[in-house]
Amino acid sequence: MSHHKKRVYPQAQAQYGQSATPLQQPAQLVPPQDPAAAGMSYAQMGMPPQGAAAPMGQPQFLTPAQEQLHQQIDQAATSMNDMHLHNVPLVDPNAYMQQQVPAQAGMPFQQQQQPLPAQVYGQPSAAMGQNMRPMNQLYPIDLLTELPPPITDLTLPPPPLVIPPEKMLVPSEVSNASPDYIRSTLNAVPKNSSLLKKSKLPFGLVIRPYQHLYDDIDPPPLNEDGLIVRCRRCRSYMNPFITFIEQGRRWRCNFCRLANDVPMQMDQTDPNDPKSRYDRNEIKCAVMEYMAPKEYTLRQPPPATYCFLVDVSQASIKSGLLATTINTLLQNLDSIPNHDERTRISILCVDNAIHYFKIPLDSDNNEGSTDQINMMDIADLEEPFLPRPNSMVVSLKACRQNIESLLTKIPQIFQSNLITSFALGPALKSAYHLIGGVGGKIIVVSGTLPNLGIGKLQRRNESGVVNTSKETAQLLSCQDSFYKNFTIDCSKVQITVDLFLASEDYMDVASLSNLSRFTAGQTHFYPGFSGKNPNDIVKFSTEFAKHISMDLCMETVMRARGSTGLRMSRFYGHFFNRSSDLCAFSTMPRDQSYLFEVNVDESIMTEYCYIQVAVLLSLNNSQRRIRIITLAMPTTESLAEVYASADQLAIASFYNSKAVEKALNSSLDEARVLINKSVQDILATYKKEIVVSNTAGGAPLRLCANLRMFPLLMHSLTKHMAFRSGIVPSDHRASALNILESLPLKYLIKNIYPDVYSLHDMADEAGLPLQTEDGETTATVVLPQPLNATSSLFERYGLYLIDNGNELFLWMGGDAVPALVFDVFGTQDIFDIPIGKQEIPVVENSEFNQRVRNIINQLRNHDDIITYQSLYIVRGASLSEPVNHASAREVATLRLWASSTLVEDKILNNESYREFLQIMKARISK
């Protein structure tokens, strides 16, 4: 318990307590994966303690039915007579190790591997038999009686992947891939396409190969011995779900069932560090990395190369964008990844000409050389040439001082520039020729619409087109084919384009974002940017600094393989789809996610299926690596089991990607129809196929508990700026669509359904550092419990914080008591508090003020995404509010914007969530 006294605001507390509705607690959807959490020991589960090997000395016995099943699988796996795959006995791996390594006299062999008093692997039991596998169970609920919906479900893990320990060589928590790396929409896979089609549930994978901006945070285990074992036929990598056969001399692939030879090197260990094959990372860990040998490398891993293409036209200078960019670069030169000290830098300034800079070595300064920093202007935009290419892309280490010197001079050089033109297209081509030999990143910082040379864009006429069927074709399409065709050239030479667009004017984000979409980059949009607003500078500088300091890998390709019957069919995210199943990333960022759609092409005959994602990459430390992510999933012929194992967050991500594609290629109306139809189809199928009896009229709206947030997420998605009907500036809508198609899952969910916190009555410990059980203080701040995103829970005197992942809104109720206003803002008059994009002032001797600022800082603290949320302070309506207050118009706009994030409410022409459910109920009852 906290010893901090809770500040009580009498009027607010009494009224809030009378009207508050306690949050509903989510039902326990499935048995916990951790036996300890269920009050069971690993021995009771038939599992060894964590970190221990499988039980040893117990050969695996098969029933006649099991032997027949293995024979059928073997015979179907190959038509090659000389492989002798059928009738191969399955042998327990520890039995093999016991035969190979004799125990020392008087000492038991590996005491930690002695058999536990548990079921012997391979012998079916009531819980683990072929026909009685443990599976997730359905928990039916009525959506209409669960209002407001229990939003704590949004933070629950997905339904467990129920894989018995005998299916793993070394059972442990890391033997199957964590949902942080890969999540399947279905954690029980239909055995045939007809069942999948009947379910109306999508089958897809949400993949995030990297979890942090910086690779030194929680890296997966690495194999450095150069031994990479792969299946001869399907080319899958050895993983925790293969089986050793023929006394361990061969291994059976869990993807295609082929028997492969085991390399002798697997059992050759360092005498000073003896290990068995079961200690190898590929056997123990579903997520791991290999140091790639030469055969995986076409050329020496290239140096990380950054080409900064900076807008120096009049608009960029006036807005303060140029000065902000240069200052941020100056402060973060040492943060740019340079692990192998080969990182190279180039800087181009662009207006109606391209300004190159020749940067000499720092050593030349010390030797009295006359070689100086020179600027070379190229005005021929049709065929721009490179005046001195060898001295314009320079080593960050060898030229560090001169790069800094150049950056300090650039604002002075262009401070009086009156040119309004910005030749982005020719500048991109010049940068392409400059770094095309090795590849790298082109980072564009622009405050002006490209209006000169190839790729010239014009302002589109939005009047009469916004919120019509023509919006996609005329406002969200690419205005000039250059921005798509150029990405093809970039992909061939391993170049990524990132965009930082900051302007008070139209930027045509819809056209420009194609540069990053197809080169594995990102588009960052800062509407209304002004260097006079410190909050704009902080947001841009923070995100730009985190972006250029983020670790990256070059020359990257990613492929997902499925076991027999599974095939990857569609791919969503920012990359170049080089072939039918190969996704190419010139550079792979650390803050994006990807979605692959999976088809069940043929009937799956096995009880378990597998997905393996392989990422081949070059790191900034001159290493070529392969990251492997392996996922095992049970299969089923039961529609109820499919529904019981559906992952509502992954399904929401799937339909989000589909809707973004539909909005960009067809129309926003079709995207909204797709979103709503996804809910209707699932509800109708559940009612028809799962519910035992149907009653007319007052029938409940049934769904399983693990999917009860799905209708809420889809309804909220239709109110997102990317999809909602109404007048939305095309730049804002295009930027919103761009964000949705690449956000990691947890931030996507927050973007769709914002977190809302009540601050005026938060718990005593909220806003204070978290304390461990030992009483030690951590850097993590305790957050209040979130509320449902509806104004019906807002009190007129309360203080609320809304976090949608992009912005923070601090809503101060118009009738808040003076004590609360003073504790937060240091003034008792609510009409004196700052409004709009502001920061909360520091109020001395106010613990409550400190706690509120701590919460805001905690919400902004990310090590896996570069976003920094600006804070908007909103004053709620009040009967005592002056009619002609100076900020009345701004306040009204802010209230409308903040209210649009309360997605359970009726917003403009969109119905409330309760009304949405009633509409769905009426549709499926027809």
From Swiss-Prot:
Q: Which GO terms describe its cellular component?
A: COPII vesicle coat; endoplasmic reticulum exit site; endoplasmic reticulum membrane; Golgi membrane
Note the Pfam families from the entry.
Gelsolin (PF00626), Sec23_BS (PF08033), Sec23_helical (PF04815), Sec23_trunk (PF04811), zf-Sec23_Sec24 (PF04810)
Q: Which domain of life is it from?
A: Eukaryota
Disulfide connectivity for this sequence is none
Protein purpose = Component of the coat protein complex II (COPII) which promotes the formation of transport vesicles from the endoplasmic reticulum (ER). The coat has two main functions, the physical deformation of the endoplasmic reticulum membrane into vesicles and the selection of cargo molecules.
Subunit: The COPII coat is composed of at least 5 proteins: the SEC23/24 complex, the SEC13/31 complex, and the protein SAR1. Golgi apparatus membrane; Peripheral membrane protein; Cytoplasmic side.
Chain residue ranges for the region called Zinc finger-like: 231-256
Q: What is its main location?
A: cytoplasm
Q: Where is this region: Disordered?
A: 1-54
Q: What is the lineage of its organism?
A: Eukaryota, Fungi, Dikarya, Ascomycota, Saccharomycotina
Question: What is the official name of this protein in its record?
Answer: Protein transport protein SEC24-2
How is this protein positioned relative to the membrane?
A: Peripheral membrane protein
Q: List, as start-end ranges, the regions of compositional bias called Low complexity.
A: 20-54
Cellular localization per UniProt:
Cytoplasm; Cytoplasmic vesicle, COPII-coated vesicle membrane; Endoplasmic reticulum membrane; Golgi apparatus membrane
Xref: InterPro entries: ADF-H/Gelsolin-like_dom_sf, Gelsolin-like_dom, Gelsolin-like_dom_sf, Sec23/24_helical_dom, Sec23/24_helical_dom_sf, Sec23/24_trunk_dom, Sec23_24_beta_S, SEC23_SEC24_subfamily
Entries under CDD domains matching the protein: Sec24-like
The UniProt annotation places Zn(2+) binding at C231, C234, C253, C256
Q: Which residues form a coiled coil?
A: none
Q: Which family does it belong to?
A: Belongs to the SEC23/SEC24 family. SEC24 subfamily.
Would the keyword Transport be found if you checked this record's keyword annotation?
yes
Keywords in alphabetical order: Cytoplasm, Cytoplasmic vesicle, Endoplasmic reticulum, ER-Golgi transport, Golgi apparatus, Membrane, Metal-binding, Protein transport, Transport, Zinc
Q: Which GO MF terms are attached to this record?
A: SNARE binding; zinc ion binding
Organism of derivation: Saccharomyces uvarum (strain ATCC 76518 / CBS 7001 / CLIB 283 / NBRC 10550 / MCYC 623 / NCYC 2669 / NRRL Y-11845)
Q: Which GO terms describe its biological process?
A: COPII-coated vesicle cargo loading; intracellular protein transport
